[in-house]
Amino acid sequence: MASLLAYGNETEMNADKNNCSELFKGGHEKGIHSVTTIASPHNGSTVSNYVSDAVAPAFLMIQLLHLKCVTGKSHNDLMLDQWGITKDPFTGEKAGFNPLACLKMALSMDHCGYDLTVQGAEKLNKMIKTVKSAYYFSYSACITKDGRNGYTKLNEDYDAFLPFKLSSPLISASVNMFIGGKFIDKSWGANDGIVPLKSALYPFEEDHITYDEAKVIIPGVWYVMPTIYGADHYDFCNAADEKAFGSRQGFFDFYMNLSKLICSV
């Protein structure tokens, strides 16, 4: 979003110059003060490749969402009318049951599941540029520990979200192999349950600095904040796991300190 606001999108501008949205025209960098990512898969997540590359899991997930819209049980507008699987935004007419459209979407590269893959994130990052006047901060978490021979494994001392007890070992095991056309080495093993720690630190090819509170913060550079060990991907939006931040108050203090940091630059 920050990159679009600042630099726009040339393809969109050339497609329809008269009716192009202001978002795609760029020139709004003065309205962006800072960008903060929290447990973000900047460079994709190998676990997403198992869903998107295999097609079948992606198809099933899209199909389930589609069925909720068809039956009227979904309270959310999924805004997938271009695929014909949610209601028409102009008429409000519900979409009919259309598994073929769901399959077509699953086979495409036009969904967030693909963007979260290793190769999808790489393509997306080539389209995104840092805004030179904005401040960038990146927070990450980790629920694994070092094992034998450079591999990682789930740290049982941490209170991980139940589904992550399946996905975390999968990420740790998905190393020393090619995934999404890229060789994934052992450094991709540590994770927060859904995002490899290596991916959460900063976007590859972007300027980055390890945060030091004693030094002046400069814009246009990613500041890599200390990794929070013991917190999983879900803990950043749930104060119930008091172990993750030391206490329930620690959860609120995390966001208060983040707010103070942003306001101080």
Model-predicted segments: where are they?
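Short glycine-enriched nucleophile-adjacent loop
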Residues: 1-11
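Helical cap/lid subdomain of alpha/beta-hydrolase-fold lipid enzymes
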Residues: 16, 20-265
